[in-house]
């Protein structure tokens, strides 16, 4: 997606009022999500050792920011892309019990991100993970959890609207569940991104399930997913139709995590079976890690959505190409 400059856009809040609203959204939403999912806030790393295999490989082509450190010259340190695998290990290390979980304020750098209205090299999200029983690894558990997150977003919207009545973007009351295969069957000639826009415009709020495995018609995945955290049959993305930009906006990517069996199967499909020898993967394959559900919820994305902003740079401080900054300035988009 390229930069979209909506016509007649004018922010309804000053920069300082926007900053106050951001704090209000963040504090309210994280309290609600912690309560609904039984999560405890925990400290999280900004970087991990490459040798542990704990970093998120995303689609497998993005380069992590990496460096060495004086005290450990023989190892490469990587800035995290996300904490998808770290959280599952942390639940075991910190002694969390059944149906207990954690959330973190995760900050990441994704240097290879294609920049546009929704995407920045700086990623901030609530990364969360919760222990479930093996028999709870099913679609119903996934849907129930999505509904709890959706409810937390709606409650935050209501409270924000009471404080900033003219500056809150209105969200739909209900959410629709649909699979990537159903989208391909309905619109086989469209690209995956176009299908997402179509269904989001039609339903307004959608949880798109089963991302990562090959689709039947095209023989290609709807979108890339690393093989070693989400179970591709039990995951999905939370999407909203965003009228100011006339596009869908993804607020969360989440899923029930791989079991020993599905990890083995997905590593094979992804031709990355060598990861089986990494410490995290060994523990998982040996049944030493709890079964979990987890995901990431974009902090800046949620603020952008609820405040009706035209660019994510209005709700977070990052680095943008000079020509993008100039184009935004001309369109009254106030980049921080």
Swiss-Prot record:
Organism ancestry: Bacteria, Bacillati, Bacillota, Bacilli, Lactobacillales
Record's protein name: Aspartate--ammonia ligase
Keyword tags: Amino-acid biosynthesis, Asparagine biosynthesis, ATP-binding, Cytoplasm, Ligase, Nucleotide-binding
Enzyme class: ligase
Pfam families documented for this protein: AsnA
Keyword Transcription regulation belongs to the record: no
PANTHER family membership: ASPARTATE--AMMONIA LIGASE
Protein's cellular compartments: Cytoplasm
Entry keyword annotation includes Manganese: no
Family: Belongs to the class-II aminoacyl-tRNA synthetase family. AsnA subfamily.
Biological process terms in GO annotation: L-asparagine biosynthetic process
EC number(s) from the headed UniProt entry: 6.3.1.1
Coiled-coil segments on the chain, per record: none
Catalytic activity: L-aspartate + NH4(+) + ATP = L-asparagine + AMP + diphosphate + H(+)
GO cellular component annotations of the record: cytosol
UniProt pathway: Amino-acid biosynthesis; L-asparagine biosynthesis; L-asparagine from L-aspartate (ammonia route): step 1/1
GO molecular function: aspartate-ammonia ligase activity; ATP binding; catalytic activity, acting on a protein; transferase activity
